[in-house]
């Protein structure tokens, strides 16, 4: 698999404190379904707000390329820690890819420096020796299925199940630390996971803005 494809843009928003204040003024909802609650976690705002389009415009400028999004995107995500997280699996991060949504992803960290913990990590699956999911119809996928005597659905199910087994199934390739007003833009086929959950309220919880898009 080829080298990681990550762009880091610091000082992303010209006035990040205004973005943070706006994000904290919005209403957050719990995950819409059990699957999202189990794997992605956190509370979301609507993507229908001014900073969604502003953020997408800044991403296009950073890439110096036009971009396309197929659905409203750019919501804020708030992730908190609670004493009620009794199950370790409920607290754990989950290694995954987002290629089914769009080819590229971006997130903006909106916590002040004094709160910044962890970041976003990228991994290689040990058994498959992949750092990203290949095209289902690629020769690479066909070779793996033949060598391991499994079908494509078996590959996808394995990746999903292994997502919580970080120490046993994955090798860490790199970590992009959280920093206030830092934007990470990356190929969403790459295996990645958030690192660090903190805070009990909106004022000190992990706050990000999330985007999925394609490049024209």
Spell out what each predicted region is.
Residues 1-185, 189-216:
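Fe(II)/2-oxoglutarate oxygenase catalytic core
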């Amino acid at each position: 698999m080829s080298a990681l494809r990550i762009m880091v843009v610091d000082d992303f928003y010209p006035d990040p404190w205004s973005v943070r204040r706006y994000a904290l003024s919005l209403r957050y909802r719990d995950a819409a379904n059990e699957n999202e609650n189990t794997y992605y976690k956190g509370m979301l705002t609507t993507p229908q707000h001014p900073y969604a389009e502003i953020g997408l415009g800044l991403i296009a400028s950073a890439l110096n390329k036009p971009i396309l999004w197929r659905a409203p995107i750019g919501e804020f995500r708030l992730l908190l820690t609670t004493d009620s997280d009794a199950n370790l699996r409920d607290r754990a991060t989950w290694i995954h890819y987002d290629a089914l949504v769009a080819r590229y992803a971006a997130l903006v960290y909106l916590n002040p420096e004094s709160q910044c913990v962890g970041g976003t990590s990228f991994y290689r699956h040990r058994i498959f020796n992949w750092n990203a999911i290949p095209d289902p119809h690629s020769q690479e996928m066909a070779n793996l299925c033949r060598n391991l005597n499994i079908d494509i659905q078996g590959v996808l199910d394995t990746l999903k199940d292994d997502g919580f087994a970080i120490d046993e199934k994955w090798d860490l390739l790199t970590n992009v630390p959280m920093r206030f007003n830092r934007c990470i833009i990356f190929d969403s086929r790459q295996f990645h996971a958030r690192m660090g959950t903190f805070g009990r309220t909106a004022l000190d919880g992990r706050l990000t803005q999330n985007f999925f898009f394609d490049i024209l």
